[in-house]
């Protein structure tokens, strides 16, 4: 069984998965969504749940630096509710403050990735960092693995 880590944006959802033992997170893909049109990519998530034997979801929670919650937190929680309704699998949230900044820094400073390529992989890498941080902290869903 695996966990899926999700970095939910307004146009894309970055997806990462844990290994079966819950030690490492790997990038999977980016799912296009359209919040305004209420297109959330749940069909693709369903395919991933089935093919990867998913036991639960970890969603990034984009809190403000002062620990307050803004509209993106509401959007992430709404996406979590949609997942829970559709799949009936447990959901947990991981503070994702600075993960996109960290992902950007990794791509620019460590991998020297072009700006064009960064846009294609930043959400995947952010999802991977969210899930890896969760696994490292032994989040409550880790017991499901």
From Swiss-Prot:
- The name of this protein is Putative pre-16S rRNA nuclease
Which SMART domains does the record associate with it? Answer: YqgFc
Q: Which UniProt keywords apply?
A: Cytoplasm, Hydrolase, Nuclease, Ribosome biogenesis
This entry carries the following GO cellular component terms, namely:
cytosol
SUPFAM superfamilies linked: Ribonuclease H-like
**Isomerase listed as a keyword:** no
Q: Where in the cell is it found?
A: Cytoplasm
The signal peptide, as residue positions, is none
Question: Domain of life of the organism in this record?
Answer: Bacteria
A Pfam family it matches: RuvX
Protein family membership: Belongs to the YqgF nuclease family.
Q: Which PANTHER family match?
A: POLYNUCLEOTIDYL TRANSFERASE, RIBONUCLEASE H-LIKE SUPERFAMILY PROTEIN
Source species: Limosilactobacillus fermentum (strain NBRC 3956 / LMG 18251)
Its EC number is: 3.1.-.-
Any one Gene Ontology molecular-function term assigned to this protein's record: nuclease activity
- CDD domains in the cross-refs: YqgF
Q: Could you list the residue ranges forming a coiled coil in this record?
A: none
The protein's role, per its UniProt record: Could be a nuclease involved in processing of the 5'-end of pre-16S rRNA.
What HAMAP family does its record include?
A: Nuclease_YqgF (MF_00651)
InterPro entries attached here? Answer: RNaseH-like_sf (IPR012337), YqgF (IPR005227), YqgF/RNaseH-like_dom (IPR006641), YqgF/RNaseH-like_dom_sf (IPR037027)
> GO terms for biological process?
rRNA 5'-end processing
């Amino acid at each position: 069984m695996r966990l899926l880590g999700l970095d939910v944006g307004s146009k894309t959802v970055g997806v990462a998965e844990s290994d079966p033992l819950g030690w490492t997170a790997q990038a999977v893909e980016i799912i296009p969504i359209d919040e305004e049109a209420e297109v959330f990519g749940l069909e693709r998530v369903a395919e991933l749940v089935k093919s990867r034997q998913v036991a639960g979801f970890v969603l990034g929670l984009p809190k403000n630096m002062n620990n307050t919650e803004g509209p993106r937190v509401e959007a992430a929680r709404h996406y979590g509710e949609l997942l829970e309704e559709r799949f009936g699998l447990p959901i947990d949230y991981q503070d994702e403050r600075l993960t996109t900044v960290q992902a950007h820094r990794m791509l620019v400073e460590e991998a020297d990735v072009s700006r064009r390529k960064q846009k294609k992989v930043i959400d995947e890498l952010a999802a991977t960092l969210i899930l890896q941080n969760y696994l490292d902290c032994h989040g409550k869903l880790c017991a499901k693995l």
